[in-house]
């Protein structure tokens, strides 16, 4: 996919390359038996609960909720604090879809000169592409023809433990 000038984003589907570079990668596996858990229709308020609302709306399978295209999905563990503003914390599990187009505003898993990162793909005010850190303590990565950039996929969900 070309984003202007001669900067091209290349998608790579070889997850072994991620693992070889010390990135924790988890392949999605389709299980023959879905685990369906109850989803209650009651909204959770930060005030007083209403006991009259205690009924199950439907059952929910987290695979169906979090994974749209199983064959194109993988998981990776976040490291560092550059994406705190996007709700991505150290050790969070990121759900990544390789089939989604990496467009302006999407959070992506990218390799820049062989180093892996998670950042927001954006055009800056000058119209140049950057990988934006969602933490002011970290600089953006200015993309140019001298950088080798490989987009591995778009982050669709974050699994975060409290």
Segments from the language model and where they lie:
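Structural motif
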Residues: 91-92, 106
């Amino acid at each position: 996919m070309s984003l202007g000038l001669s900067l091209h984003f290349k998608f790579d589907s070889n997850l072994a390359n991620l693992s070889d570079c010390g990135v924790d990668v988890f392949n999605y596996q389709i299980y023959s038996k879905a685990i369906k858990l109850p989803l209650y229709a009651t909204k959770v308020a930060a005030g007083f609960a209403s006991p009259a609302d205690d009924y199950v709306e439907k059952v929910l399978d987290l695979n169906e909720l979090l994974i749209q295209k199983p064959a194109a999905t993988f998981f990776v563990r976040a490291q560092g604090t550059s994406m705190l503003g996007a709700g991505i914390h150290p050790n969070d599990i990121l759900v990544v879809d390789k089939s989604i187009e990496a467009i302006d505003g999407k959070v992506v898993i990218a390799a820049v000169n062989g180093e892996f990162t998670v950042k927001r793909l954006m055009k800056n005010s000058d119209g140049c592409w950057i990988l934006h850190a969602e933490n002011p303590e970290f600089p953006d990565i200015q993309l140019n023809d001298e950088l080798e950039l490989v987009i591995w996929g778009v982050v669709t969900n974050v699994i975060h433990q409290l």
